[in-house]
Amino acid sequence: MGSPAAPEGALGYVREFTRHSSDVLGNLNELRLRGILTDVTLLVGGQPLRAHKAVLIACSGFFYSIFRGRAGVGVDVLSLPGGPEARGFAPLLDFMYTSRLRLSPATAPAVLAAATYLQMEHVVQACHRFIQASYEPLGISLRPLEAEPPTPPTAPPPGSPRRSEGHPDPPTESRSCSQGPPSPASPDPKACNWKKYKYIVLNSQASQAGSLVGERSSGQPCPQARLPSGDEASSSSSSSSSSSEEGPIPGPQSRLSPTAATVQFKCGAPASTPYLLTSQAQDTSGSPSERARPLPGSEFFSCQNCEAVAGCSSGLDSLVPGDEDKPYKCQLCRSSFRYKGNLASHRTVHTGEKPYHCSICGARFNRPANLKTHSRIHSGEKPYKCETCGSRFVQVAHLRAHVLIHTGEKPYPCPTCGTRFRHLQTLKSHVRIHTGEKPYHCDPCGLHFRHKSQLRLHLRQKHGAATNTKVHYHILGGP
């Protein structure tokens, strides 16, 4: 008996297995460790390392240029003389198969040199950030140095693998081997809202005040930057200002002058002029004009907060954010605001006042925008739509969280066990398993729970509570 035919015009179904890619990568790593189907032996520092060509090609622009076409089919043993050190290459090989990069202050320079050699730009950037974050707590500000061009072959292939986030560019697309300066990096899509930005960016970098780290081929950290004097300052500033007008700022792998990079000043001002950084602590009191002082023997002024260099003191005034930009101050926490209405909304944080209430369910809010978002629950309005599956959401934050299901991203790893999570709040709840914290307390019976959902279930089952309201849990009966 045959199965019934599908009705005409019925919708199809596509199910995405978000863990499939990580499972495949894990299986490939297990095959590598067992030496199964490995088709190339890499000789790095005299040490043989077995691997799969397909994985190497997918992760490295250097290996793509070596193994592409028929010429790479017969390559069974590949020696890298004068290339990366074994202690720098081994972590990269593990990263290709596990998506986890292990860095320490001792191994980071070697990993950086190996990643540059293999044209793995995303790893190069991660090493730069790690090294910079390691030096900034010591009060040392690093500046870019002249970087040597990469030595591996860079013959342009006719085609290249598909580019994707978390994978390097093939030789034709790699900025590290191009002649022109690279284009500015696009913002991290995982840092689009403030919670993810705070976790991913602020926790991974001690500060963004210093310029990107430049590494010598020996892997030694570059020396501390210093302020130039006299003609040296004027010539450096003039050359850097002219280069900034011609095109974008070059990256850390290009040849840079010490004053050519552009980042954010330590005092919070955007860097729109050439600058130099030192590790000397300066007094941060006074107005922007008072904090600008002339450099000895030159016509340039430097900011005493962050050693920014400008052609005149008024130039620093426009860079340093002054108190006059935010005249409204909170008397309790000294926070400053540009508009009076923002200060009034902020005060409700201290007073606990919630003047805006929902006329349907009575829920109260301290900001009108929160009430407007809440009202969509009752009206059924869902203005934010997923372009992949068509699902709609009340809040844009819910849409951002939903999109991660399609991309398969899990950007939040547990620092204890390494388990990765799609959402920051899920990670916070998971960490309580390791810490033993149980912050949710049942008043009637004194029990503590690790998760709010456990408390809600307990209140419903044991105490007959109505937990379907955000205002409070109303216990209807006794235990």
From Swiss-Prot:
Pfam families: BTB, zf-C2H2. It is found in: Nucleus. SUPFAM superfamilies: beta-beta-alpha zinc fingers, POZ domain. A zinc finger (C2H2-type) spans 328-350, 356-378, 384-406, 412-434, 440-463. Ubiquitously expressed with higher expression found in heart and placenta. It comes from Homo sapiens. Residues 143-190, 210-259 are annotated as: Disordered. GO terms for biological process: negative regulation of transcription by RNA polymerase II; regulation of cell differentiation; regulation of cell population proliferation; regulation of cytokine production; regulation of immune system process; regulation of inflammatory response; type 2 immune response. It comes from the Eukaryota. Residues 234-244 have a biased composition (Low complexity). One of its GO terms (molecular function) is DNA-binding transcription repressor activity, RNA polymerase II-specific. Residues 147-160 have a biased composition (Pro residues). This is B-cell CLL/lymphoma 6 member B protein. Keywords: Metal-binding, Nucleus, Repeat, Zinc, Zinc-finger. GO terms for cellular component: nucleoplasm. Residues 162-172 have a biased composition (Basic and acidic residues). Gene3D superfamilies: Classic Zinc Finger (3.30.160.60), Potassium Channel Kv1.1, Chain A (3.30.710.10). Acts as a sequence-specific transcriptional repressor in association with BCL6. May function in a narrow stage or be related to some events in the early B-cell development. Associates with BCL6 through the BTB domain. InterPro entries: BTB/POZ_dom, SKP1/BTB/POZ_sf, Znf_C2H2_sf, Znf_C2H2_type, ZnFinger_BTB_dom_contain. Residues 38-105 form the BTB domain.
